[in-house]
Amino acid sequence: MFWLLIAILIVQRAAEMAVARQNEQKVKKQGAIEFGESHYPYIITMHILFFLSLIAEVLLMNKQPSSWWLGIAAVILSVQIVRYWALCSLGAYWNTKILVVPGVELVKKGPYKWMKHPNYAVVILEILLIPLLYQAYVTMCLFSIFNAVLLSVRIRAEDKALQEYSVK
């Protein structure tokens, strides 16, 4: 079951990166400006290391699924629904990079009606829940900290870019 989860997550991330590349091309044709280029490689690296850490911790420490695995899995699936709701709400404006088309209105539909950064909330929950599924507490704690640091930089950069270039 562990390898199936890893495979699903890797396929999901690869598909998202493909969509992000397509969306990047679309919005750059509309004049999108990229922000946060300096921290972007760290975000990619953190996500790769998250999976490697999870795999290493589960295998090397012989971690087994939590006795709460069914409930945790249900929450993870619910979080995925929110992820795709957020992505679909942004449409071509969704990206893994910070790309802002000057003069375009901020999206205020879907989960963006209630929350400024729902996809980041999803990532926070995933970094907590996925390791929790296999009791990989070291990965959960370390990468929650790494993610918090990176998101603090990322959200500031994104908010500044959106404030300067988007129509409110």
Curated annotation (Swiss-Prot):
Major location category of this protein: membrane
Cystines in this chain: none
Record GO terms (molecular function): protein C-terminal S-isoprenylcysteine carboxyl O-methyltransferase activity
Gene3D superfamilies from the UniProt entry: 1.20.120.1630
Localisation per UniProt entry: Cell membrane
Membrane-crossing segments per the record: 1-21, 41-61, 68-88, 123-143
Topology in the lipid bilayer: Multi-pass membrane protein
Pfam families, per the entry: ICMT
Cellular component aspect of the GO annotation: plasma membrane
Alphabetical UniProt keywords: Cell membrane, Membrane, Transmembrane, Transmembrane helix
Name of the protein this chain belongs to: Uncharacterized protein YpbQ
Organism: Bacillus subtilis (strain 168)
